[in-house]
Amino acid sequence: MTDGKLSTSTNGVAFMGILDGRPGNPLQNLQHVNLKAPRLLSAPEYGPKLKLRALEDRHSLQSVDSGIPTLEIGNPEPVPCSAVHVRRKQSDSDLIPERAFQSACALPSCAPPAPSSTEREQSVRKSSTFPRTGYDSVKLYSPTSKALTRSDDVSVCSVSSLGTELSTTLSVSNEDILDLVVTSSSSAIVTLENDDDPQFTNVTLSSIKETRGLHQQDCVHEAEEGSKLKILGPFSNFFARNLLARKQSARLDKHNDLGWKLFGKAPLRENAQKDSKRIQKEYEDKAGRPSKPPSPKQNVRKNLDFEPLSTTALILEDRPANLPAKPAEEAQKHRQQYEEMVVQAKKRELKEAQRRKKQLEERCRVEESIGNAVLTWNNEILPNWETMWCSRKVRDLWWQGIPPSVRGKVWSLAIGNELNITHELFDICLARAKERWRSLSTGGSEVENEDAGFSAADREASLELIKLDISRTFPNLCIFQQGGPYHDMLHSILGAYTCYRPDVGYVQGMSFIAAVLILNLDTADAFIAFSNLLNKPCQMAFFRVDHGLMLTYFAAFEVFFEENLPKLFAHFKKNNLTPDIYLIDWIFTLYSKSLPLDLACRIWDVFCRDGEEFLFRTALGILKLFEDILTKMDFIHMAQFLTRLPEDLPAEELFASIATIQMQSRNKKWAQVLTALQKDSREMEKGSPSLRH
C-alpha cells in the first residue's frame, strides 16, 4: 500500500501507484503494482488539511529543506494487497467539503479482472521523497479493490512548491489519457507507464533550463538499455517527449524582452553598452551641433578641446525601460547643468593648459639659455679666464647663474688656491686621518709631535661630531648618509681637513659646504676648494668663533640694513631681534642649509665672484623679500621664520630683491665700512679695559 501527501498550485490530486523513486536513479520493480485495477482521481479545492482514515502513513518524513512538507515514498516493509486503491474515508465525510469532490474526473472504466493469488502476495513499496507545498494535503491509501473504478491508464502530475525553488512533477501517463503538467523553476520529473510489465524509466532533478537537455540524455540512456525499453512495448516512444519545451521557450522569450536582468544570462539592452563618445555624438546630433571628424592623431589634443568623459555618460544616459521616463523639465534642467559643467571644465582645463604652457616655455627658455651659456663659457671665457673673468659680459652671465656642467671649474678658478694645496697633500692628510681613526678605534694613545698640543679627547670629539653631522647633511637627498654614494667622500674631506688644520678642527656647518663642493667637483679638487674657502677672513672668523670679529661683521650688516630697509630695521630694534639670531646659520653654511639646493648654488656662483659682501647682500635681499610679512610679526615669530625659510622660495624673485640692495652707505662700500668698524673696535678695546675680557 502506498500513502502520501501531494498538492499542486491549483488542486490537490489523490493518486497512487508509485514505487521506489529517487531523484537521479531509475526506479525498478514496477511490476509489483497492479495498474490494471480501477482507480479514482479526485482534486479537492484549497482548504484545510483533510482528515482521512486512521490508516495513515507513519513512515512519511518532513522535508529537511526549511520545513517544506514532502511526499514521502520510502522502502518500508512489504504490504500485501491485490490492487492499489484510492478511497475517501466515510467517517470524515462531514469534515470534507462536498465541492471538493464535484470536480473529480470520471475516468473510463471497465470490469476489473479478478486478482490472482500471485498479485495478492505481491508487495508495494513507497517511493522517495518529493517536495510539495503546504496548501493542501491528501492522504493516499487503498483499503479494498471494490471501491475503485476502472481506468486503463492514468497520468498525474503534482507540483509547484510556490514558496521554494524546487517543485515536483510526477507523471504517470500514456498517449490517450489525462496528461497534466505543472512546473516551476525547478522540478523533479518521474514518468511512469503501465503495460503488461510496467516499469519506471528515470528520475531527474534539474532546473527548468536544463530539463530539455536532461530529457535528451535520458533518451540516450534508455536507448542503451534496449532490453528494458522493449518491455515497455508501444509506449516507449513517449519518453522522447519534452513536456517543458513550450513553457521553457516562452519563459526565455519573456526574460529576453526585459532590459534589466539581475540574475540570469540574458544580455542587457543595447543602450546599456554605449560608451561615452557614442552618447556624446548622439547628444550633439540632437542639439544640432555637427560632430568633428576623428583626428588622425587621436592621442594629441588640438586647440585644448574638452572631451567629456564620465559626466556625459551619467547625465545624458536614458533611464532604464522599467523606470518611469524623465520629465521634460527635469531633462532640460539636467542638460543645462551638464552644459554648465562642461563650460566650467573647459575653463579650468584652459587655465591649467595655459599654466603648463607657460612653464614649458619658461623651461625651454632656460634650457636654451643654459645651452648657449655653456658654449660661451667653454669656448670664450674659460680659455681666457685671466682676461675675461672681470668683464661686463662675464659678470652678467655670472649673475644669471653658471651652467651646472661648468660650475665646478668656475668655482675652482674663482676661489683660487692661495694655500697651494696639491693632490699629494690631500692624500697625506687623508692617510693621517685614517690612521687616527684606526688608533682611536683600537684604543691606541700614540700622539704625533705636531699634534702634541691637541689632546686625544679633542680629536675623538671632532671625529664623533663629523660622524653625527654627516648623517644630518641634506637628509632629503639620501646620498651622504651611511651607505650612500657620497658618504665616504664627505667623510674623507672632513677628516683630512681636521688633520690639515688641527687648530680649527671640525665645526658644525662644515659638512654642508663640503657636500656642495662634492656635488660639483672631484674629491681632491673639492678638498682644495674647501680649504681655501674656509681660509677667507669671514669664514675663518666664524669657524674659529672669533667673537669680536663676528660682532664687527654684524655691525657692518646693520649699517647697510638701516640704509636699505629702515622701516624693518626699526621694527627689529623695537623687538630686540639682533642679527646673530639668523645670520650665524646663514653664514656658517653659506645658505646651503637654509635655502633650496639649486638656489643656494646660484648664490654660491655670485659669492665666488663678489666674495663675502654678497653673503650679507643676500641676507638683506631675503629681508626685503619678506618685509611685509616680518613687519606684522613679533619677536618669536620673526626668529622662527628667519631660521626656517620657506622651501618654495622663488629664485628669480629673490635675485630681483637682491639686485635692489645697494651695498653703499655714505659713499662707503662694504669693505670700507667693515675696515672702519674693525679700527673702531680696536680703539675701543684699547680705551675700555672692560672690553679686553
Curated annotation (Swiss-Prot):
Listed InterPro entries: Rab-GAP-TBC_dom, Rab-GAP_TBC_sf, Rab_GAP_TBC_domain
Main subcellular location of this protein, as a coarse class: Golgi
- Tell me the residues on which Phosphoserine occurs: 91, 295
Q: Which domain of life is it from?
A: Eukaryota
Q: What effect is documented for mutating residue 472 to A?
A: Loss of inhibition of autophagosome formation
| Residue spans of biased composition, Basic and acidic residues class | 271-288
Q: Name one GO biological process term.
A: negative regulation of autophagy
Q: Which SUPFAM superfamilies match?
A: Ypt/Rab-GAP domain of gyp1p (SSF47923)
Give the protein's function: Plays a role in the regulation of starvation-induced autophagosome formation. Together with the TRAPPIII complex, regulates a constitutive trafficking step from peripheral recycling endosomes to the early Golgi, maintaining the cycling pool of ATG9 required for initiation of autophagy.
- Region annotation (Disordered) maps to 108-130, 271-304
Provide the effect of residue 508 to A: Loss of inhibition of autophagosome formation
Please tell me the species this chain comes from.
Homo sapiens
Name of this protein: TBC1 domain family member 14
Any one cellular-component term (Gene Ontology): recycling endosome
In its UniProt record, a GO molecular function of this protein is:
GTPase activator activity
The entry describes its oligomerization and partners as: Interacts with ULK1. May interact with RAB11A and RAB11B, but does not exhibit any GTPase-activating activity toward these proteins. Interacts with TRAPPC8.
Supply the alphabetized keyword list: Autophagy, Golgi apparatus, GTPase activation, Phosphoprotein
Per UniProt, subcellular location reads as: Golgi apparatus, cis-Golgi network; Golgi apparatus, trans-Golgi network
